[in-house]
Amino acid sequence: MDLRLAGRRALVTGAGKGIGRSIVKALHAAGARVVAVSRTQADLDSLVRECPGVETVCVDLADWEATEQALGGVGPVDLLVNNAAVAFLQPFLEVTKEAYDMSFSVNLRAVIQVSQIVARGLIARGAPGVIVNVSSQASQRGLTNHSVYCSTKGALDTLTKVMAVELGPHKIRVNAVNPTVVMTPMGQAAWSDPQKAKAMLDRIPLGRFAEVENVVDTILFLLSDRSSMTTGSTVPVDGGFLAT
């Protein structure tokens, strides 16, 4: 199925590794013009070697002023994927101010800021656009040691709905994807303990974790005009976890 993404200009945050990097590669392969955002220059440099022509921006999205300076003049953007996120796994009684502040700065505040930049540009141009926020199954379930992470993703789901309501009249669609554990290198390392993995897999009706392409394919569909009537949705990519 041709998603007709060729020629569209897309901005992807958290583009240096994992899901974000794979999103950039898929968009590039589909003919989109991609702006890749990461806080790690070495990751961006290697990404450009893989995908010549990709534009890069190196900035720490936890820094509001630096983000404004780096992205304020990014130019016209048609598609935005807010993928950047951090996760500090701490028991509730041991949550630190530093983990709380960093988590909400990156997982929620940066989404607001970058989305504002892109949406204002779309409205000024009178152009339609699409925003996809990468959330998590953790937004809708209580997971041990994930109190702050779950909170940020729950807030992101609600933000997605509000953005869809307010930006819809401007022909800007906003959706979220909510993956289960994804088999990125980080995911593989975090869930390598068979006992830990079994406890989660037993809660997934399909009995497996998600592959990166499962998430990327869903995001590309939501970015495309094939989903032109879909906005304000949180789309599980979880093998049925949230259905249980």
Swiss-Prot record:
Positions where N-acetylmethionine occurs in the chain: 1
Coiled coil spans: none
Annotated localization: Membrane
Modified residues (Phosphoserine): 46
InterPro entries assigned to the protein according to its UniProt record, in alphabetical order: L-xylulose/Carbonyl_redctase, NAD(P)-bd_dom_sf, Sc_DH/Rdtase_CS, SDR_fam
Keyword Acetylation: yes
GO biological process: D-xylose metabolic process; glucose metabolic process; xylulose metabolic process
Omega-N-methylarginine: residues carrying this PTM: 21
Protein name: L-xylulose reductase
Organism: Bos taurus (Bovine)
